[in-house]
Amino acid sequence: MEEKPVVAIWGAGRCNDLDLEMLAPYVRFVLIDRTMEDIQAARARYGLSEAQCVCVDLRFWEIYEEEERFFETLLANGDDLHLSEYLRQVMESVAEQQPTFAGYEKAFDFSVVCGLASQLNARFAGLLQLYGKDLRRLPRTAAMMKEMNVQAAGRLMDAIMVTTSGAVF
């Protein structure tokens, strides 16, 4: 029996914009997201077994809700220096974490990534918008958010290259 290629979908979430059922006869899936409940719900919705569809959080860019909530509390009275310094600390903390991909080195034949890099730090940007903060008036914070996005995209690409043996889409 021929082995089906393994397709990893990075930032899969609930797969609301994907039709896994259409590809299921031809491939095996690995759904990657930091919210396990979402990717498990997607697998269940499509009626895929664990052999057909593995759900995993590779933890390559770990920012926790507590850090996001603390940033939200800073927004009330925090100035540009304090906001940017906090984001720098978060970024350094994440950068110090060395993700391990034990068991996943070159495990995927193909990786599919759409817009994930921009989502990795999106909550911080969303909070600034929610609180009516103008990034033009917060140049240090804007610069730090840009640097966080560069770091997140780099970490994502490193993870993809370690785990993918074939093409990246």
Regions found by a protein language model. Give the residues of each.
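Conserved class I S-adenosyl-L-methionine
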Residues: 3-15
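Conserved SAM-binding loop of SAM-dependent methyltransferases across substrates and taxa
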Residues: 13-26
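Short beta-strand element of Class I
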Residues: 28-32
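Conserved SAM/SAH-binding beta-strand->alpha-helix loop
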Residues: 35-36
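S-adenosyl-L-methionine
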Residues: 45-105
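Mobile active-site "lid"/loop adjacent to the S-adenosyl-L-methionine
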Residues: 85-90, 95-103, 119-155
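A conserved beta-strand element that flanks and buttresses the S-adenosyl-L-methionine
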Residues: 112
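A structural motif corresponding to the C-terminal end of an alpha-helix
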Residues: 152-169
